[in-house]
C-alpha cells in the first residue's frame, strides 16, 4: 500500500479486502447487543471484539455489517489458518497485517475458526498490541482472554434465515444450480456452491450437514 497497490510480500497471500457486503443487513440474524467498534486511531482499553461462532451463523457477513454500521465501509480480512506456525514468523505476519490496515485506515476481520484454541490466544495477544479495531471470529467453544463485554456468541442461523440467504444469492448470481445440503454453510459457502457446484465447498464446512428446510415465511 505504499503507492503500488500491493500488500507486504510476507502477508500478500493472507490478506484480502472486504468492501462489498455479500448479504444485506436485514437478512442477517440478530446477535443482540454488540460491543462498540472504536474509531480508528482512538485510544481505548481494547480494540478487539471476539465473535464465537457456530458454522452456519453468517459470522463474516455479520462482522462486516457491524463494521459498516460503525462507519467503516471496508475491512481487511486476515485468514489466521494460513499464518506461519513458527512463533516469530507468525508475530511478524500479524504485525505486517496490522501495518497494512493502519496504512489503509481500515479495521480488520480475522477468521480464526479453523485454528486451535492455543493459536487463537496467541493471535489475539498479538492483535491486542495495536489500536486497529479488529473483529476476531473463532469457534463456538474457544476460551479467550477478553472482557465478557467484548465477546459475542453467535449461534447457527435459523433455517428461515439460511433459506433467505439461498434465495437472495440465487437471484444475485442467476444460477440454475441448487444447494440442498447447506444447514451449516456460511453465505460464502452457499455462493461458492451456486457458482461452481457441489464439488467445491469451503474447507471449514463440517461433514455432517443436513438438508435445509424451506419454510414459507422467513422469520428473523
Regions found by a protein language model. Name each.
Residues 1-74, 80-83, 96, 133-220:
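AAA+ P-loop ATPase motor domain of ring mechanoenzymes
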Residues 76-138:
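Conserved P-loop NTPase "ATPase switch" module shared by AAA+ and STAND
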Amino acid at each position: 500500500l505504499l503507492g503500488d497497490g500491493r500488500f507486504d510480500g510476507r502477508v500478500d497471500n493472507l490478506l484480502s479486502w472486504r468492501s462489498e457486503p455479500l448479504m444485506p443487513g436485514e437478512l442477517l440474524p440478530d446477535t443482540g447487543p454488540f460491543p462498540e467498534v472504536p474509531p480508528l486511531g482512538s485510544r481505548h482499553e481494547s480494540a478487539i471484539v471476539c465473535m464465537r461462532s457456530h458454522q452456519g451463523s453468517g459470522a463474516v457477513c455479520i462482522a462486516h455489517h457491524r463494521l459498516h454500521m460503525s462507519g467503516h465501509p471496508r475491512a481487511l480480512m486476515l485468514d489466521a489458518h494460513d499464518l506461519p506456525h513458527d512463533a516469530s514468523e507468525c508475530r511478524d505476519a500479524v504485525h505486517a497485517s496490522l501495518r497494512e490496515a493502519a496504512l489503509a485506515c481500515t479495521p480488520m476481520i480475522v477468521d480464526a475458526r479453523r485454528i486451535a484454541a492455543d493459536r487463537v490466544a496467541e493471535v489475539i495477544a498479538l492483535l491486542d498490541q495495536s489500536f486497529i479495531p479488529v473483529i476476531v471470529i473463532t469457534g463456538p467453544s474457544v476460551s479467550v482472554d477478553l472482557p465478557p463485554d467484548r465477546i459475542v456468541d453467535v449461534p447457527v442461523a435459523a433455517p428461515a434465515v439460511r433459506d433467505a440467504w439461498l434465495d437472495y444469492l440465487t437471484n444475485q448470481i442467476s444460477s440454475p444450480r441448487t444447494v440442498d445440503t447447506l444447514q451449516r454453510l456460511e453465505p460464502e459457502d452457499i455462493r461458492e456452491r451456486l457458482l461452481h457446484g457441489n464439488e467445491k465447498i469451503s474447507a471449514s464446512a463440517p461433514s455432517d450437514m443436513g438438508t435445509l428446510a424451506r419454510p414459507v415465511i422467513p422469520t428473523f
